Amino acid sequence: MKLILITTALLQSLLFASFSGNIVDKNTSAPIINAIISDSIISVKSDENGSFTIDTNETNIHIKAYGYRPYKINFENNTTNLKLESITVKALYLTFWAANTTSKRIKKILNMIDDTEVNALVIDIKNEYGSTVFKTSFEQANSYGAHKNRTNRDIENFMQLLKSKNIYTIARIVTFKDELQASNNPDYAIKKIDGTIWRNHDNMAWVDPYDVRSHEYAISMAEEAAKVGFDEINFDYIRFPAKAGLKFCETNNQENRVKTIGEFLDLAQSRLRKYGVFISVDTYGNICWSNDDNNIGQTVLSLAKHADYISPMLYPSGFASGSFYFEYPSEHPYAVIYRSIKNIKDRIDSKRVRPWLQYFKDYAHTKRHYRKFEVREQIRATEDINTSGWMMWSPSSRYHLNYFVKEDE
């Protein structure tokens, strides 16, 4: 028996090696507390001195810390003093149709990045219809023809171009709204009470978030984005439809909805751990002013527990007349952003909030055009409330360079 125990201990020591290090800010050398150090199986956190030890036999070790670029440990450098580069993400949305090296839109945006504060892009990888921007190795999606409308025929070269400019890359994955997946799998599509597939106003079907097959599908797609080198996975439509009278495979109540979204994110964190990517989730802007799940399965507290960043869509035009005591919230872009984020600081550190900002005409009230003043006021609010940055939503990905040049530059 003693020999067996000694042999077991010896095998464990041979199989698992301890790696220790210290994580500091690249510019200030200050220790980074609660950084997440992961191999494909386990994660540990750095202590108050930025120190950590991880027992692993793997050579790919990744570090994530809020407000920093992801970091991959290079064992060839034989260093234990690990310096992370801080980043305040300032991102533009890049539409599905422009996400390739030859589009005129991407060329203009890359020139803009060279000359402005913009340092990141949110890129459609799977859109609302279910189409993928490049042909992945995910055979289930390919069997549905998800790649047929792809606009990027050389994703490796595209990613290399972005990395050469030190652009922080965010892969947008539309999660449960997926016409292709739902129409090819009617057994787990969201149904109307009569049993037929429900489609919303744009004639798009959704898959049932309660069915784990919908989780596997979206996370498999996220893995494809992680494999080609994205820094972050952004899950959009990671919610239940905001509509009553639909049929699901489980009892549809707040407890079950919130639990289901949490389980999805836990699985995503587990499966994506080995790639070292951050996970962000998109939410309605009114999540900042609500304590319940608004019938869609999202609360600030529940998302903060499972995701790295939350991205409320704080479009001033999306708030009803009378919100914030303003007749027209769209005329007060600074106040809408600042007050909304301030209202959730007791539930999540503002450094883990990166809102979507409005870069389109007011559609709800005064039809006000959002030009440089409105854009800069929104950005100023994110700076004053100390968020992790911002993401600008222009549905067409058309942007003006001078909107993103600070006045003092």
State each model region's role.
Residues 30-31, 41-54:
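Short, acidic Ser/Thr/Gly-rich low-complexity loop/linker segments typical of extracellular
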